[in-house]
Structures are given as structure tokens and as C-alpha cells.
Regions:
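Repeated loop/turn-to-beta-strand initiation elements of outer-membrane beta-barrel proteins
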Residues: 81-85, 146-149, 215-221
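Transmembrane beta-barrel strands of outer-membrane/channel proteins
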Residues: 37-45, 87-93, 151-157, 221-225, ...
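Transmembrane beta-barrel domains of outer membrane proteins
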Residues: 26, 70-76, 138-140, 208-212, ...
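Extracellular/periplasm-exposed beta-strand and loop segments of Gram-negative cell-envelope proteins
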Residues: 45-64, 94-131, 158-200, 228-246
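Outer-membrane beta-barrel "beta-signal"
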Residues: 211-217, 243-255
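Cleavable N-terminal export/targeting peptides
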Residues: 1-32
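Outer-membrane beta-barrel channels and translocator barrels
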Residues: 30, 74-80, 144, 214-216
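Hydrophobic, lipid-facing positions within transmembrane beta-strands of outer-membrane proteins
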Residues: 35, 65-71, 131-137, 203-207, ...
């Protein structure tokens, strides 16, 4: 993965040098350029890779209303205008609500204004609602006058955050799987909030396609995968990593 990342950076560096040379001639922003704006909604979530053994059943999933808005520019670098480099900026939400039945699920909750850690068995509800400012950089290939494919990397900065929820209908063993038993029943809940443990910077990969309805309007699907986890490396209150994996569906306007 590191070699692939370095290869992409090297390719983009060579392209940037070529762009700079052309910019000296005053043609960079007018020659072989394409500009567009896009809007989308997203379906997905912050999820582990595979289902951990602690999660026995997902009883509810709500993707919520998650929207994004992007502006990007494509520079065609081949003479036939089939290959290009695209740079964009977008603001996007990533979120979901879930309910799951778990067993021996390591977590940290707040009870009577005190934090307690341990292994919980019962029901866990989670509410995630985060906003990012993202810069995607992609290689674009024009398959036909109506179809384009693209793929590349993105870097995101977290600007608004929420990762919270509660546990109920079960019990927690403090510190170890055989520790002191704390019971949550008859409507008793214990909250948790890991918002401040979310990673500020995230990066990942994206793959997408665009279909041109006409000269200006486009439809597109796009898959985003967060390569690094959503939590800081020192975060230990969940025993497995969570990654942002989302499918974006939307429309755009090409100028």
C-alpha cells in the first residue's frame, strides 16, 4: 500500500510539473480544462472490516440523511483528451445510526458521572454524525463521450463531530471478562461519547464513474474507503478499528 501511495504521489508530481510549465505560457486554466460542481447523498457507515465476534446481531441500521457538495477541475493531459488529472474540494457528511446485540464487547461508558470500562453484553446504540472538508485527487479516463471512470486518493479534515450512544438491557464486567458485574435493566442506560477521540485527519481511496445525460448534466456513483481508522491511534475504548466506507450517489453540472 505504501508503494502504491508513493507511486501515485510521483505521478501527480510529474503532472504538476507539466502543469506548471504550461501555466508559464498562460494557458493552464483555459486549455484542455473542464470544471464541474456535484451534489450527492451517501449510504454507508463507520464499520469494521468484517463482523467482529463481539457483535452478535445488528438489529437496526439507519443511514440517515448524509449530503455532500463538491467543486472540481479536470486537466486533460493526453492529446486525445482521454486521460486527465482531477483536483477537487468538497464538504461532506458521514453518519449513521445503529443498534446491535453484543457479547463481551469492550467499551467505556459513563455511569453516575464516572467512567467505567469493561466487557458489555446486551444492546448498544450508536449515533454518528461527522462533517469533513475533503480534497480528492484522481486520475480520469474518458471511456466514451458519455462515460468517464476515475480513481484516486483523498485527504479529509474533520470539522464537526459526533460519535455517541448508550448501552442498555444487559450487563458490564468491569476491567476484565470476570470483573465486577454492573447491570443495566428495566430501562436503565449508560451513555458513551467518543467524539473527542475521533481522528482529525483521514485519508483514503475513491473509485467512481460519470454518465453524461447531455452536454452539461451528469449522474455518478462513487465509492469511498477510509484507509486509516476514524479514531486516534491511542484510542482503546473499542477493541477493533472502524473505517469510513460510503457509496455516494449524485448529480453534477459541467460548465
Amino acid at each position: 500500500m505504501k508503494k502504491i501511495f508513493l507511486a501515485v504521489l510521483a505521478t501527480l508530481g510529474i503532472s504538476s510539473f507539466a502543469f506548471a510549465q504550461e501555466n508559464e505560457n498562460g494557458n493552464f486554466f483555459t486549455r484542455d480544462m473542464e470544471y464541474q460542481v456535484k451534489a450527492n447523498f451517501s449510504i454507508g457507515g463507520s464499520t469494521p472490516l468484517g463482523i467482529p465476534r463481539e457483535i452478535r446481531k445488528i438489529t437496526h441500521y439507519n443511514p440517515t440523511l448524509v449530503l455532500g457538495l463538491e467543486a472540481d477541475a479536470t486537466k486533460w493531459v493526453s492529446n486525445d483528451k482521454k486521460w486527465g488529472i482531477r483536483v477537487g474540494i468538497r464538504t461532506e457528511g458521514k453518519g449513521m445510526k445503529t443498534e446491535a446485540v453484543v457479547k463481551s464487547y469492550f467499551t467505556e461508558v459513563i455511569q453516575n458521572d464516572e467512567k467505567i470500562k469493561g466487557y458489555f453484553t446486551g444492546t448498544v446504540e450508536t449515533d454518528i454524525k461527522n462533517t469533513y472538508v475533503t480534497m480528492p485527487v484522481s486520475v480520469v479516463y474518458k471511456v466514451s463521450p458519455r462515460w468517464k471512470l476515475y480513481g484516486g486518493l483523498y485527504a479529509s479534515i474533520l470539522v464537526d463531530k459526533n460519535f455517541s450512544g448508550y448501552v442498555s438491557d444487559g450487563y458490564l464486567r468491569q476491567d476484565t471478562p470476570i470483573g465486577t458485574k454492573v447491570v443495566f435493566e428495566n430501562g436503565t442506560k449508560a451513555n458513551y461519547n467518543f467524539s473527542n477521540d475521533l481522528r482529525l485527519f483521514q485519508w483514503g481511496g475513491q473509485l467512481g464513474a460519470e454518465w453524461h445525460l447531455n452536454k452539461h448534466f451528469i449522474l455518478f456513483p462513487e465509492l469511498n474507503y477510509g484507509i486509516n481508522g476514524i479514531f486516534k491511534s491511542e484510542f482503546k475504548s473499542i477493541s477493533f478499528a472502524l473505517h469510513n466506507i460510503y457509496l455516494n450517489l449524485g448529480f453534477g453540472y459541467k460548465f
